Amino acid sequence: MTEINGNLSAEGLNFCIVVGRFNDLITNKLLEGAIDCIVRHGGSEDNITVVRVPGSFEIPLIAKKVAKTGKYDAVICLGAVIRGSTPHFEYVAAEVTKGIALVSLETEIPVSYGILTTDTIEQAVERAGTKMGNKGFDAALSAIEMANLIKEIR
């Protein structure tokens, strides 16, 4: 039996982080977490490109554009969609989720999902580096592992 696993070394890997500016109190913390993860796992800030977009809804398009350049081993998507009193939350959350999944499938580049979808700002804060860890860090960790796994399979 053969088992293939991706390792957690970011050394020599190139990343693009696509981050929404909307709810930047949260998304900036997610970005800090993602960069921290890459550096802690042997990556270099010189191998990280950050692209800021207006909000989470715009993330899939730019993720696809950067993935198609062939410059990056993985794309990390970071954003925060916080429920309001309208159905807008459901529409945005669903479309962003579908869009990010499609980008990965269409480009065959790992695209990690670091989009917070929470009911309150407090829940978002908890997931951006306080009680519940930092989901930006988690998304970067997934991107590192998947980039290495793809290299192993190729």
Curated annotation (Swiss-Prot):
Q: What are the protein's UniProt keywords? A: Riboflavin biosynthesis, Transferase
Q: Which parts of the sequence bind 5-amino-6-(D-ribitylamino)uracil?
A: F22, S56, F57, E58, A80, V81, I82, Y113
Q: Does the keyword Acyltransferase apply?
A: no
Name the InterPro entries for this protein.
LS (IPR034964), LS/RS (IPR002180), LS/RS_sf (IPR036467)
UniProt pathway: Cofactor biosynthesis; riboflavin biosynthesis; riboflavin from 2-hydroxy-3-oxobutyl phosphate and 5-amino-6-(D-ribitylamino)uracil: step 1/2
Query: Which reactions appear under catalytic activity for this entry?
Result: (2S)-2-hydroxy-3-oxobutyl phosphate + 5-amino-6-(D-ribitylamino)uracil = 6,7-dimethyl-8-(1-D-ribityl)lumazine + phosphate + 2 H2O + H(+)
Q: Catalytic residues?
A: H88 (proton donor)
The enzyme's main class, written as a single word, is transferase
Q: Which species is this UniProt entry from?
A: Persephonella marina (strain DSM 14350 / EX-H1)
Q: Which Gene3D superfamilies match?
A: Lumazine/riboflavin synthase
Name the UniProt record assigns to this protein: 6,7-dimethyl-8-ribityllumazine synthase
Tree of life domain: Bacteria
Question: Biological process (GO) annotations?
Answer: riboflavin biosynthetic process
Any single GO molecular-function term of the entry would be: 6,7-dimethyl-8-ribityllumazine synthase activity
Q: What does this protein do?
A: Catalyzes the formation of 6,7-dimethyl-8-ribityllumazine by condensation of 5-amino-6-(D-ribitylamino)uracil with 3,4-dihydroxy-2-butanone 4-phosphate. This is the penultimate step in the biosynthesis of riboflavin.
How it assembles, according to the record, is:
Forms an icosahedral capsid composed of 60 subunits, arranged as a dodecamer of pentamers.
Gene Ontology, cellular component aspect: cytosol; riboflavin synthase complex
Give a yes or no for keyword Nucleotide-binding in this entry: no
What is stated as this protein's family in its record? Belongs to the DMRL synthase family.
Q: Where does (2S)-2-hydroxy-3-oxobutyl phosphate bind?
A: S85, T86, R127
EC number(s) for this protein? 2.5.1.78
HAMAP family the record matches: Lumazine_synth
